[in-house]
């Protein structure tokens, strides 16, 4: 399947808004329906199929099954349920729409996110979408009394264990997310959105130094070396994955003053070669670049033949016996690359060994 034919899907926020509209229409008309259409923030009119409909005197609920298209999304196939309950409004008050979470929706426990601490993890755009569709349904009669809207995901707590929610301080379930309502297939947006949120949380929690890791192994090494829980708080550790350039530029934009880049040799070599995105198949070119660095230095010229014959960066490192000059040559170039993107920050590099030891820090 080529990228051109990959199918887009819909966010949890769009699904929640569609389910809310379905429940509202059933309440208004007193009959079960199977389908609704909503207008997404970008103006697209999209149909959604409803499931598990229930209708009572002052209660209605239904679900939408999330279709993430061809995006490998953890929440693809999840049931997004919305229940609406009408209650008498206090005397002298107007109709109100109160949006809250239920089973499988997380609560925010750390500052820095779009939702305040203590609130359900239903982001502002989905909240607005839900209120808009309910107001549309009751446009003629006006919203009756107090309308309580509860969003839930039956297996949300279990699914959340496969996400970074807990790290961001979202506990007990998933988030209801989305700004456009549309999930782009195989896009980096979900990851870069998480990087944005993680940096915001870290700064809001008072972290002065942020540790950006290329993967979980290097992050674990950094946590031990930097004494997680003693010298460094957990919010400071941010998994940037392959999005090195994006993470560094975001740190620069948000005024981060001290950064540690943690990674293993192969990933750090890509960064040293100037790759802002390290998910690239350029091992041969990276090794050629490494050779050009090693040759002029008499301390590493003996490694040139090894680097030319090697198939991988890891092979060069291991067969060099973790040569300290080799490691410094790469790590110093990582610092130089980062300094060009984050000019006002202090940069350090932590090289994690393949045996989960620290090979270089400085």
Curated annotation (Swiss-Prot):
UniProt key word Acetylation: no
Any one GO BP annotation for this protein: anaerobic cobalamin biosynthetic process
Organism domain of life: Bacteria
Metabolic or biological pathway: Cofactor biosynthesis; adenosylcobalamin biosynthesis; cob(II)yrinate a,c-diamide from sirohydrochlorin (anaerobic route): step 6/10
InterPro entries, per database record: CbiD, CbiD_sf
Coiled-coil ranges per UniProt: none
Gene3D superfamilies, per database record: CbiD-like
GO MF annotations in UniProt: cobalt-precorrin-5B C1-methyltransferase activity
Key words of the record: Cobalamin biosynthesis, Methyltransferase, S-adenosyl-L-methionine, Transferase
The protein's enzyme class: transferase
Pfam family, one: CbiD
Enzyme Commission number(s): 2.1.1.195
Record's keyword annotation contains Transferase: yes
Catalytic reactions on record: Co-precorrin-5B + S-adenosyl-L-methionine = Co-precorrin-6A + S-adenosyl-L-homocysteine
PANTHER family, alphabetized: COBALT-PRECORRIN-5B C(1)-METHYLTRANSFERASE (PTHR35863:SF1)
Family note: Belongs to the CbiD family.
UniProt-recorded name of the protein: Cobalt-precorrin-5B C(1)-methyltransferase
Organism for this UniProt entry: Geotalea daltonii (strain DSM 22248 / JCM 15807 / FRC-32)
Upper taxonomic lineage: Bacteria, Pseudomonadati, Thermodesulfobacteriota, Desulfuromonadia, Geobacterales
Encoding gene, per UniProt annotation: cbiD
